Structure formats: structure tokens, C-alpha cells
Amino acid sequence: MPVITLQYDDLEKLTGTDKETIIKRAPMIGADIERVEEESIDIEFFPDRPDLYSVEGAARAMRGFLDLETGLSKYEIKPPKVSISVSEKILRIRPFLGCAVVRGIKFTSSSIKSLMDLQEDLHWGLGRNRKKVSIGVHDLSNVKPPFRYMAVDPGFKFVPLDYTEKMSMTEILEKHPKGTRFAHLVRGFKKYPIILDSDDNVLSFPPIINGTLTSVTESTTDLFIDVTGLGEAVYTALNIVVTALAERGGQIEFVKVVRPDSGELILPDLEPKTRFLTKTEVRDLLGMELSIEEIVKQLERMRFGAKALDEETIEVKVPAYRADILHNYDLVEDIAKGYGYENIKVKIPETYTPGKSHPISLLRAPVNEIMVGLGYYEVMPFTLTSEKINFENMRRQKTDDVTYVLHPISEDQTMIRTTLLPNLLEILALNQHRELPQKIFEFGEVVNNEITGQHVAAVSIHPQANFTEIYEVVDALMREMMLPYEVKESEDPAFLEGRRADVYVNGKKLGVFGEFHPEVINNFALGYAVVGFELDLNDLIGQS
């Protein structure tokens, strides 16, 4: 979780209160205090509240909690003077774009650092290390609109941030620190994303690096903000950044985004989303009776717009910068925070309900211990994936046992995974900048025919990775679990013929292991030999 350093003088100015009150009340808005210094406080905010990843966002929330300023924050937005066109070709590479202009900002070195920290924390919290969301912040005075978001050849040259000489985009990916770190995000594409002004000056090579021309300094007053990505989280990130800048006195200005697929968009869209909450929902979840007036009061303390429609129903306006409100339960949680958990009376349960470990946990613990003992690190990736990752990249045929997401919000999360190995290979692809060998495993859930199963899988990448290495790992795991097994020749297309095997226990196939096929390695843009295994452990659950 991100740890944000907040300067007292900045926070006191933005909240209108003193540092003693800040230290005392900060945990109540959803944070843990990590460190208290003479001039600053380090606060760890929960990952579901990216709107608190800046001093401006934290101050906005704290003003409400302290009853200094309650209800929905309102931001004036000026008509658009800047436009940006989106090319057809970029839609196949990085299709989502959100933009805004913020004028009249007075920067200091600390406020610039705060903005850059917010940018990087959002890359982590919303962007999955820039894959889903990447943010560019530019000095608008050094470029000339209208702008263009397009795809260009890898040989295109410009001067990247912190450099003085022109480099081709290929050279940036090979030599620039940011390029080598994030090259995997554009690897495999024949053209790369770029944002240009009307004179062909480079603003950004998203999601890698900005051009040096638009660097933000203390003399900067007007900003152009671009957010690119793979889904609608782009717009949430844009809203968080522009409202944070508005809290510091900036004037938000619309930008006209001209798309080839959906026409014109006028961004940012700061219109709040409307939800309807009932008094009964609050009572049933909190276990206590609150009046309709009290519920409205606590929602406004948490910076929602709230209005009682009758004695049972409240209309709630959710700020456009809140990424965490997915259900009415999230509203009730904020009501509890506003009311104060310390004010909720303790009630001892009337029935005695002793707990015990779940059978899955009883199997997970020894398996994890064995894998860690074999030198593997545990990872816990997402269970949502795509057909491309789950099947195409693995050279496997699509099956009929897939559970699909009805309304996916991004192209890389359209189904629930049926196997663990593709996720592990994705993680290796994201960590190519780290030392080899890399050995990771997961004990996790897969879903086939809408039935949840438990699998364990592991992969190892380094130049000498081979069949014998992974065979020894599988053998050690099976021996430690005291499972007699046999291996037979496999036909799994994800692995090399002659260097793959199926695992059988009591005549039933349990899994597969071997050396991955070069095509699979290339599909995940991995540069070294990779071996792996995956075992279905469902039949072992509940066994002593």
C-alpha cells in the first residue's frame, strides 16, 4: 500500500486545522500512521482509496470528517480551448485516452513532488504498473495545440525526459531507465503510441516516458494532462489528478477529444454518479438503527452528496474521483467511518461458534511450505484473464468450460481463468528488469464449468532452465506430500514435444510439467528458457 508523506504546513493550510488534530483524526478516514516527524507525517492509505494518495485529496477528506466542509465538492470547469485527435491505428494498441487542462497553478518544489508522487502512486494503485493506466503531466506553455494521439514507427526520434540528445523509441526502450523498466508494455507492437503537438513536438511516449520539452518546473502555471490505458480506469485517474490540482487553486478546463470510433468526448467528466440507499440496508449491515437525518449527515461528512427522498430512501451523489464505490455496501462502510467505529456499541454474539481451518487451508499450508523450501516465491495474481492469455498465448485450443464476465470493463479481463500457468508467465514478463533466476508459484483458484477448483503451479526462468529441473521439483513435491505417482508422455501444446510429461495419481491425470514451447515464450515476450508445472489438487482436499 502507498505511504504518503504529508507536510504539516501544507496540510494545515489545505485543511484549516492544526497538526495535533491531523495526527489524532487521520486514521479515521481510512489510513494507518506509519511515522510522525517534526515537519511531516507518513500515512499509509488503503489501496481502495486512490483519491487519498495526495495531500490535496487527504485534506479534502479530512475537512469533511472534521465538519469543516461537508457534502459534495463542486469544481467549476471552463469551456475547452484545447483539442486532441485520436488516430484509428492507436485503438489497437492503447485505446483509451483522457485529457484535461488545469490553469493558474502556483507551484513550489514540494507541490511538484506531491504531484509526481500522486502520479506514480496512481500508476501502482489504478494502473497495474502503467499497464492499465499511465499519466503524463506537461507544461502547456511549451507546446502548441491541437494535439494528436497516434501510432508511429519505432525509429521515430525525440529527446526524452532527463536527456539532452534525441533517441529513437527503440533506443529509449533499450537504454533509458524508464524504457527498460516498462518496455514489456509495448513489446510486440509494430508501432508505438505518441502524443504530438501541431508542430510535431513530442509531449509523451505513453506509457513509457514524457518528452523533455514539457517538463514541469516551479515557473509552470498551466498544465496539460494526458491519461492513456486499456479501460475506463483512465477517466477515474484523470478525475483524481485534476480535482487534486483544483484543491490547490487550479482552474480546470475541458479538452475536446476527437475519436474515430465514438466522435467527440468532452473531458474531464466530473458529474457524480447517483445511487439510492435505504435506511433498511444501513440497519441490516451495521446492526444498529440510525435516523434518516443521521445517515445523510454521515454521508456528507464523507464528502458525498446526500438527500432524503422520504423516510426510507436517500439519494446519494458519488464523487467522480471515488473509484471504490462499487456497491451500496461501500456507502454503508463510509457511514460507519463517519459515525465512528468507536461509537458503535459492542454486542456479544448469543451463540457459541468455534472456528476451525478450512480443508483448503489445511492443504495449502503444507504445499506452500514445500514450494518455499524448494526456493520458489509465492505470488497471488488476479483470477480474471482473457482468451488471448489463457488460450492463444499458451498454444492451447479454446474449451467450452469457460466462465465469462458478462460486462467486462477491459479487454484483458473477460473471463475467469481455467489454469494458473498463464498468470505466472505474465508475472515473469512484468519482472524482466529483475535478476535471474526467477522462481515463482501459486496455490490458487481456477474455474471450469462454473466449478471452482484448487491448483498449484510454478514456473522458473533462467538460461539453463530444463526438463530435469522441473521434474525434480514435481518429484520433491509429490514425495513430501506422500503421493505415489507416475509420469506419461504428454501432448500439451504449451510445452516442447519430448520435454513434457503428464502426472498421474491412482490412474487419474493430476497435471503436466515440462519446458515451455518457444512460441509460448515468445508470446509472453520472455527472453530465456522457461519451465513449469501445474497440478489439480481438488481430489486431495479433505484428505489427512
Curated annotation (Swiss-Prot):
EC number from the UniProt entry: 6.1.1.20
Keyword hit for Nucleotide-binding: yes
PROSITE patterns: B5 (PS51483)
Keyword Translocase included in the entry's annotation: no
CDD domains membership: PheRS_beta_core
Record GO biological process: phenylalanyl-tRNA aminoacylation
Domain B5 per the UniProt entry, residue ranges: 270-346
A Pfam match: B5
Catalysis performed (reactions): tRNA(Phe) + L-phenylalanine + ATP = L-phenylalanyl-tRNA(Phe) + AMP + diphosphate + H(+)
Residues that hold Mg(2+) according to the record: 324, 330, 333-334
Keywords: Aminoacyl-tRNA synthetase, ATP-binding, Cytoplasm, Ligase, Magnesium, Metal-binding, Nucleotide-binding, Protein biosynthesis
Cellular compartment(s): Cytoplasm
Molecular function GO terms recorded: ATP binding; magnesium ion binding; phenylalanine-tRNA ligase activity; RNA binding
Broadest EC class assigned to this enzyme: ligase
Chief subcellular location: cytoplasm
Cofactor(s) recorded in Swiss-Prot or TrEMBL: Mg(2+)
Segments traversing the membrane: none
HAMAP family: Phe_tRNA_synth_beta2
Protein name: Phenylalanine--tRNA ligase beta subunit
Organism: Methanosarcina barkeri (strain Fusaro / DSM 804)
